[in-house]
């Protein structure tokens, strides 16, 4: 029972993602997110944090994978709620307009 629900969820996510790609909405959402994150200073905050980590550990001792692993949780936490809410609203509107999924 649990497996079939997970499978249905995965199928639904795949169908939604496919529709987002086909309509070009996925790219528009990514552009909106990129602009909003720059606008609120998120990109600069993360860049500064990356520099701190590299300075702490030394350039020779940090791989890109290390940096990503260290930065990702902070990056997610720093996304303002207003940006999350706006993106979620855009996705909900899109889904309402394409309810045939």
From Swiss-Prot:
Database matches in InterPro entries: TF_ENY2 (IPR018783), TF_EnY2_sf (IPR038212)
Keyword annotations of the record: Acetylation, Activator, Chromatin regulator, Isopeptide bond, mRNA transport, Nucleus, Protein transport, Transcription, Transcription regulation, Translocation, Transport, Ubl conjugation
One Pfam family here: EnY2
Cellular component, GO annotation: DUBm complex; mitochondrion; nuclear pore nuclear basket; nucleoplasm; SAGA complex; transcription export complex 2; transcription factor TFTC complex
Record localization: Nucleus, Nucleoplasm
Molecular functions (GO terms): chromatin binding; transcription coactivator activity
Site of covalent link Glycyl lysine isopeptide (Lys-Gly) (interchain with G-Cter in SUMO2): 74
Any GO BP annotation: regulation of DNA repair
Function: Involved in mRNA export coupled transcription activation by association with both the TREX-2 and the SAGA complexes. The transcription regulatory histone acetylation (HAT) complex SAGA is a multiprotein complex that activates transcription by remodeling chromatin and mediating histone acetylation and deubiquitination. Within the SAGA complex, participates in a subcomplex that specifically deubiquitinates both histones H2A and H2B. The SAGA complex is recruited to specific gene promoters by activators such as MYC, where it is required for transcription.
Subunit field text: Component of the nuclear pore complex (NPC)-associated TREX-2 complex (transcription and export complex 2), composed of at least ENY2, the isoform GANP of the MCM3AP gene, PCID2, SEM1, and either centrin CETN2 or CETN3. TREX-2 contains 2 ENY2 chains. The TREX-2 complex also associates with ALYREF/ALY and with the nucleoporin NUP153. Component of some SAGA transcription coactivator-HAT complexes, at least composed of ATXN7, ATXN7L3, ENY2, GCN5L2, SUPT3H/SPT3, TAF10, TRRAP and USP22.
Family statement: Belongs to the ENY2 family.
Full protein name: Transcription and mRNA export factor ENY2
The species this protein was found in: Homo sapiens
